[in-house]
Amino acid sequence: MNAATKLPGDVGPIHFVGIGGIGMSGIAEVLLNHGYRVQGSDLKPTRITRRLEELGARVFVGQRPENIEDAEVIVISSAIKPGNAELDAARARGLPIVRRAEMLGELMRLKSNIAVAGTHGKTTTTTMVATLLDAGEFDPTVVNGGIIHAYGSNARKGEGEWMVVEADESDGTFNRLPATIAIVTNIDPEHMEHWGDFDTLRQGFLDFVSNIPFYGVAVCCTDHPEVQALVGKITDRRVITYGFNAQADVRAVNLRYAGGVAYFDVALQAEGTVIEGCSLPMPGDHNVSNALSAIAVARHLGMKAEVIKTALAAFGGVNRRFTRVGEIDGVTIIDDYGHHPVEIAAVLKAARQATEGRVIAVHQPHRYSRLSSLFDDFCACFNDADVVGIAEVYAAGEDPIPGAGRDDLVAGLIRHGHRHARAVVGEDDLERLVREQTRPGDMVVCLGAGTISAWANGLPARLQKGAA
């Protein structure tokens, strides 16, 4: 009998503990589309779990030992710890326990792969690469960390050779993914609760790009000093650089913004050619940078300039990445996932480029530990906002840390020179702030990884109701 060398087709049911999570659900969906028997549990039903049920998954609400009675394999994320009823029951039965990234890696072994890593921009970049490959008729399989508007999902099964995945560095498992093409957007000190220190994180990214095969390529943004330093350490593998700087292989030039659209040309310095007249229907230098990485991959795979330009111009974006949720009385409401100071600064700069009015930022800090460790950075990242509202910290299970609360951040912003920062004590107060501070032409940007998204999505109806 020959031992299996890849994921057997008859394995299962495969049970996902926390199947509704954005990272878990995409893998579950692709497994379903490949004909595997998939089930899972989550604490409450959501749009994501309902979609998985429609695709054939069995979904349990709540996590109990009896949920895994029929399971043969258990998939967990780093959020699932000993003491979880299903994990403990699975271990008692001797079932295989598979980390999320390990299962993603098994799927990747079926294809050639493009893996997108970086502290910020992974989800948008993954979507851009998938969009271009789709337009180039590569028909890629995709597993993303956000809902792609064009798909209505964070995953799709393609029939082509290529698979595009978001490589999450948060728990250190991303450098086990078998990437053929590895993209690195940027490297900042984040997820230190896992990595311990910045040098270890740097080594993690070096391991990630060093794992590509000799026929692969690393695609790296050398506008970022840490990534440029990483490029200097990559040996015996091909590297394509991108960015705005004059040394980048794939470089954006002649960038301008009009009506929230980025217009630019792309200098392909190794080819000695320029792709003129590119446009991207979302503002922000960071988004143009992300697009450059996708263009680099597309050209590496032989895509023509006109196909690339057409696909970029029609880019539909990703949920919660500068997502326009409504416009009331000339005031635009934006929902964005940004919760790190670098992300917040980039989003607010994009808002400045997208509106001629004022920018009102409302932020819900995510985790006391992040706010505490990056406190000075948070105090300096809102300069492009005319008005800043700070909501209570979304704890994500953490205990409060002295000096790292909502009012501390408001005081810190004022101390660092912000002219108009205040606390927002709830949805009613958010509505009050917007009514008091906005006028036609302004933009309200709600930022954070917690419940602030629900506030943003509910705000247009609240404002409309009050105006009626």
From Swiss-Prot:
InterPro entries: Mur-like_cat_sf (IPR036565), Mur_ligase_C (IPR004101), Mur_ligase_C_dom_sf (IPR036615), Mur_ligase_cen (IPR013221), Mur_ligase_N (IPR000713), MurCDEF_pg_biosynth (IPR050061), UDP-N-AcMur_Ala_ligase_MurC (IPR005758)
Pathway involvement of the protein, from the record: Cell wall biogenesis; peptidoglycan biosynthesis
SUPFAM superfamilies per the UniProt record, alphabetical: MurCD N-terminal domain, MurD-like peptide ligases, catalytic domain, MurD-like peptide ligases, peptide-binding domain
Gene3D superfamilies: Mur ligase, C-terminal domain, Mur-like, catalytic domain, NAD(P)-binding Rossmann-like Domain
Gene Ontology, cellular component aspect: cytoplasm
GO process annotations (BP): cell division; cell wall organization; peptidoglycan biosynthetic process; regulation of cell shape
Protein keywords: ATP-binding, Cell cycle, Cell division, Cell shape, Cell wall biogenesis/degradation, Cytoplasm, Ligase, Nucleotide-binding, Peptidoglycan synthesis
Pfam families: Mur_ligase, Mur_ligase_C, Mur_ligase_M
Binding site for ATP: 118-124
Subcellular location per the Swiss-Prot or TrEMBL entry: Cytoplasm
Single GO MF descriptor: ATP binding
Family: Belongs to the MurCDEF family.
Record protein name field: UDP-N-acetylmuramate--L-alanine ligase
Gene behind this protein: murC
